[in-house]
Amino acid sequence: MNFEQYESAYPPRALPPGAWVTRIGPSPTGKAHIGTALQAVINRSLADGSGGAFLLRIEDTDRERFVEGAIEDLLAALDWLGIRPDESVAHGGAYGPYVQSERLPIYQAAARQLVEVGHAYYCFCTPERLESVRMAQQAAGKPTMYDRHCRNLGREEVEKRLATGEKAVVRLKVPDGTEIAFDDLARGRIAFESQTIDDSVLLKSDGFPTYHLAVVVDDHLMRVNQIIRGEEWIPSTPKHVLLYQYFGWPMPRIAHTPILRDMSRRKLSKRSGDTSITGYRVQGYLPEGLRNFLTRIIWPHPEGKDVYDHEEFVRLFKAEDLPNTGPIVDPQLLDFINGQYLRRLSSAELYTATVEYLKFLLGLHQDIIFETYHPSAPIKQTLTRAELGSFYSAFTANPTYTERVLTLEPERYKRLSDIVVSTGFFFPALFTPADPKLLAKPLGSPEKAGALLGEYLRLYRPDAAQAEWEQSVRELAHEAGVKDGKLFMTLRVAVTGREQTPPLFEVLTILGGDEVQRRLELAAAMPVSL
């Protein structure tokens, strides 16, 4: 088939004027990155806000970098984020296939058409020759570009060499002495001189296209009319401008998003931790919180809000609002925003969300490392899969009890992982008595701690009101000649095994008299020698 025949299978879309057809085109080279999530949120929102359509296209033409399972990871990550494409390999659609490796005949026909009209040419240069040219250019301090050795081969010679089976690629024919420019919706006019643009490969010798050919052909056939992609593609855009001109197609509106940066303003990378979408899910972020954060770092709300309903972003955001400088992925801002979404949940909803989160973690079949941001280095805490399993069993054994636990100072929770690492002491099966040194720390000696705990046990009344309970502890401290706060801390450590917890009286109330007494007896009976 020639290209016109393929093109006839992709008619214009029946959409209202001003409707944007957007897309993302990730490559399946590993776990889906948080940058892909940002692109998906932006493009989905622009389509929704205009009554358009949002497509997910898998750009898998670089077979050497293809990672098995990456497509499935991407689909699961977007589904968790609540970003559903209108068309994709999973959702179908009238403009597929949505995987580039399934569209090879289309690209091959497009490349042949470009050659036939003189806008591209066959190149027979071997890898060895290309490497020799590259090294010579580097030695001379020149840009490394193809030297156009095959650009002016005669038609007869080309056909003869192809007929003998000689391997060839198809290269873009870049014009000489021309300015190639485009209007970026967020950055304004960007121009390149044609002598700085390489005669790039469009079709490889194995029949697979490069990004340049595939993305232009697909965006045209799928009727994409607004492209939002990362700024790393700005140097490639003049090649795409030429291709649109050579094919005689209108070029979509285009804007480039800046690269995400870490707190040191370096490009976000693995040194910043796990930057995959799944990695953020592991850390306990809600999809709503992560979506809000991603929109917040690229768009200032008109009223200066950090937290807002996503519908506001969809209604107000335009591609022209995109920033030119790299957004900072600030973990503290993300924690703040996510914490606000957690506080919107009732205790029952928070319980359900935590249970689903635990099921997800257990389904990974691995130990989990929770990370908390610190300027010098992340604070890490590891839970084995066995420990997670034990926590899940205890957490779900009595939902009514667990929901009472979750009502205590919900503002402490910034992520669902905070619940996992901070509430274990509430469950008898998970409680571990404090280290004797920690128990002795407030009062200065294990003997004094043991004696006062024993005395407190004789006074302890589970049914006492808070004021009465506090007064009894203060009187005991006064009689023993110690500060109130030190005795309260000793009781806290004895009952919870920790120095930091929600208000102690509320903890005692939830645990119940029998469990509190059991723990106090354990603490009072600890060896006095350390």
From Swiss-Prot:
Highest taxon above the source species: Bacteria
Coiled-coil spans in chain: none
Residues engaged in binding ATP: 270
Placement of sequence motif 'KMSKS' region: 267-271
Short motif ('HIGH' region): ranges: 26-36
EC number: 6.1.1.17
InterPro entries reported for this sequence: aa-tRNA-synth_I_cd-bd (IPR045462), aa-tRNA-synth_I_codon-bd_sub2 (IPR020751), aa_tRNA-synth_I_cd-bd_sf (IPR008925), Glu-tRNA-ligase_bac/mito (IPR004527), Glu/Gln-tRNA-synth (IPR000924), Glu/Gln-tRNA-synth_Ib_cat-dom (IPR020058), GluQ/Sye (IPR049940), GluRS_core (IPR033910)
Top EC category: ligase
GO biological process: glutamyl-tRNA aminoacylation
Gene3D superfamilies: 1.10.10.350, HUPs
Quaternary structure and interacting proteins, as annotated: Monomer.
Role played: Catalyzes the attachment of glutamate to tRNA(Glu) in a two-step reaction: glutamate is first activated by ATP to form Glu-AMP and then transferred to the acceptor end of tRNA(Glu).
Family statement drawn from the similarity comment of this UniProt entry: Belongs to the class-I aminoacyl-tRNA synthetase family. Glutamate--tRNA ligase type 1 subfamily.
UniProt-recorded name of the protein: Glutamate--tRNA ligase
Organism field: Gloeobacter violaceus (strain ATCC 29082 / PCC 7421)
Lineage, opening ranks: Bacteria, Bacillati, Cyanobacteriota, Cyanophyceae, Gloeobacterales
